Amino acid sequence: MEEDEVTIREQNFYSQVRECIICFLLFAILYIVSYFIIKRYKRKGDEQEDEDATVNRVSLFLCTFTLAVSGGAVLLLPFSIISNEILLCFPKSYYIQWLNGSLIHGLWNLVSLFSNLCLFVLMPFAFFFLESEGFAGLKKGIKARILETIIMLILLALLIFGIVWVASALIDNSSASMESLYDLWDCYLPYLYSCISLMGCLLLLLCTPVGLSRMFTVMGQLLVKPTILEDIDEQMYIISLQEEALQRKLNGGNYTADYSRKKIEHDLLNARSMKSKLERRKNASAWQRNLVYPAVMILLLIATFSSVILVSLNILRLLVDETAMPKGSKGSGFGDASLFTFGFAGATLEIILIFYLMVSSVVGFYSLRFFSSFTPRKDDTTMTKVIGNCLSILVLSSALPVMSRTLGITRFDLLGDFGRFNWLGNFYIVVAYNLMFAVMTTLCLVRKFTSAVREELLKAIGLDRLQLSNKSSDSPSPNGHQKSL
């Protein structure tokens, strides 16, 4: 009997060690990838040799950690889905014993914990630490900046928890909620994270439909269009004229204080870079020009309409079945049953659709005018913008599993703290969310594909002159018949 207990304890110990090693390796890979991504966009001029360099290194480490957690949140649902199918295909294989329900639940809990840590502690600390200078009267240095940052974090925490306490007291009229703060960990922190999750899902609701329509323009800029859709020779001629004009202005010293020599050199480099890209597009083969572009556009159409159809079907399920609610569904255990009719193929298609929604949400986020100034630029992004971008990506990626389950894109149950949000059990919020997503996506697609027809109709009836004031802000696309959203 004692030997059996020792054997069980040893197995549990080895299982926990194995899970820790796997989690560490996965996070190390994500951290390395995130580091190179940030270094690609971070401004090189931010690297000083004084205390500011130390502050920048600390902020860079925290931003890299946050971006790695964001990557883990994005991969969380696809990894869980594919792991469930692998366990069903090879239930007793020796080589996949490490892949079990305990590991998956541990990953969900770790991502939830680190998301909270980055959102409420690390990112505010990085921002305040970067902007701090030390209190007046104290000796300048790293210690003074750390002291100021900690005090600012304490004041921010008091402000946020005060707002959350008032909000929860207004919603719940019981005397306990208005008189006590003892249940801070059990009540107010989950309530705060639930509000942040709802805000992230609302941000995804705003960004994803815009991104789904914007993806056609983005892919059109990356791929080589057929000759009938764009005239590369004309574009190269225009770029060559711009390059010659900038070169003459630079050589002649014809620039003012507003249009300095540095800006002329920057515009000249951009013109030459655009010219080299156009030359590569011109030298593309015939199959790239006539086959790849239509195939990609068709795939985008299929993925977009598939997401709209799945959301529409989910609305019908919500109306007739209580288990369709994201918080009310209690499926079988991990690795016990498949969630797809077509097994591995269905899981693969679902994972592709989830990644497509995430990419579309990021594209839509940077396409919105309010967030367009956040767009990172290669080797020209300040550390403050890096912090803002990492925080935005964290909010979007943390809400991705919740949005995918709420819209019915996947039937995989939310694990850990992701499935404990109160608003997931509200029928009206979930149905309204699905309806708004379907309607907004349809309207964005209709606006996208009818823009050329709408412009021609306005020209035919003479109303295009009324929009002359807006044409300077809306730059046409290279093919001349599409407008960016």
Swiss-Prot record:
Organism encoding this protein: Xenopus tropicalis (Western clawed frog)
TM segment ranges: 19-39, 62-82, 110-130, 150-170, 192-212, 291-311, 339-359, 383-403, 426-446
Q: What is this protein called?
A: Limb region 1 protein homolog
Provide the primary localization: membrane
Q: Which spans of this chain does the record mark as coiled coil? A: 261-284
Which residues are exposed on the Cytoplasmic face of the membrane?
Answer: 40-61, 131-149, 213-290, 360-382, 447-485
Q: What does this protein do?
A: Putative membrane receptor.
Origin, by domain of life?
A: Eukaryota
Instruction: Tell me the InterPro entries matching this sequence.
Output: LIMR, LMBR1-like_membr_prot
| A single GO cellular-component term on record | membrane
Provide the alphabetized UniProt keywords.
Coiled coil, Membrane, Receptor, Transmembrane, Transmembrane helix
Instruction: Please give the Pfam families that the UniProt record associates with this protein.
Output: LMBR1 (PF04791)
Q: Which residues lie on this side of the membrane: Extracellular?
A: 1-18, 83-109, 171-191, 312-338, 404-425
Task: Return the similarity comment.
Answer: Belongs to the LIMR family.
Q: Where in the cell is it found?
A: Membrane
Its record classes its membrane topology as: Multi-pass membrane protein
